[in-house]
């Protein structure tokens, strides 16, 4: 899945950086550098999305149709 999401990155008081994604509640990351914080955030987003998809699919009947849609 490809998506463009917002990463908000701030310096942490104790050093390093933390990052959040406002479009994905609960998605956050941290690291010693901005690059590490972004990588940590990307991993968190992937895990959250995969987990939510698994939860949704568990309740669907077998005959449900799953398609990909593009949003410009």
Curated annotation (Swiss-Prot):
InterPro entries: TA_system_antitoxin (IPR051404), TTHA1013/TTHA0281-like (IPR035069)
Source domain of life: Bacteria
Any one GO BP annotation for this protein: regulation of DNA-templated transcription
UniProt record similarity statement: Belongs to the UPF0150 family.
This protein's name: UPF0150 protein ssl0738
């Amino acid at each position: 899945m490809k998506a463009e999401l917002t990463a908000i990155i701030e310096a942490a008081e104790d050093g390093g950086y933390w990052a959040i994604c406002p479009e994905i509640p609960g998605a956050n990351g941290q690291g010693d550098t901005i690059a590490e914080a972004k990588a940590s955030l990307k991993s968190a987003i992937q895990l959250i999305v995969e987990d939510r998809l698994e939860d949704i699919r568990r309740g669907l009947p077998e005959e449900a149709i799953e398609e990909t849609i593009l949003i410009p």
